[in-house]
Amino acid sequence: MPVTKSYFMTVVVVLILVDETTGGLFGFRSSKRQEPWIACELYQGLCRNACQKYEIQYLSCPKTRKCCLKYPRKITSF
């Protein structure tokens, strides 16, 4: 009897975890629409048509836009 109870609890825990994970049991995301991945957001940049004065272009964004990253400090001219 104790073996059956532990087996049942294991099955219940696995089913709860499968339901709560975003990818499901095998990693498929069929119920949710997957958004396109933008590399610019990984570096906390913004996609713009032109970068501002204190930003640098690092990568390209979709639709031929520029990925603008802010400098860590304000750069002053000498």
UniProtKB/Swiss-Prot annotation:
Its main location: secreted. InterPro entries: Beta_defensin_dom (IPR025933). GO terms for biological process: defense response to bacterium; innate immune response. Highly expressed in the cauda epididymis. It is found in: Secreted. GO terms for cellular component: extracellular region. The keyword Hydrolase does not apply. The keyword Metal-binding does not apply. Disulfide bonds join C40-C67, C47-C61, C51-C68. It holds the Pfam family Defensin_beta_2. Has antibacterial activity. Belongs to the beta-defensin family. This is Beta-defensin 29. It comes from Mus musculus. The gene is Defb29.
